[in-house]
């Protein structure tokens, strides 16, 4: 019964934090676009972009660590494998949220932005490639949302799972008499 409670708590927490992480990553897309719209380019824009990326990167690591520690404190009988599974669930759910948003952004929200960027790329590349290759690249635009979803989902999930593995090793359960290496 206690393991079912831990599993239920784990999914509830993962859903909440998955939405938060996915929201942070989705908002970061628009911060980059806002910088372009405000013409924050050049050295200052690059530095600001790096600072924002660093803040997002470190902030997400700290937030993941906080979520895992809080779960450990709220569920004293949770072992390290439970804490890792929480992180894994957060990673997969946030990857799902972010990937879905990225596809919606490409297909519905910022269609003109992506169309203009893709047209610019095709125009520049067409100067060096044969016409047949250029036509094949134009046909890839139809599949861009699919590739974006799959690529983002795999990358974000793997990154989050590795991060969860690393962080869960440093978050012991509250009960020193529980064998933390045991899989339940």
Predicted regions and their residues:
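Alpha-helical transmembrane spans of integral membrane proteins, capturing the lipid-embedded, hydrophobic core
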Residues: 14, 18-26, 53-58, 87, ...
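Membrane-helix interface/capping segments
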Residues: 63-82
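Transmembrane alpha-helical segments in integral membrane proteins
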Residues: 63, 145-176
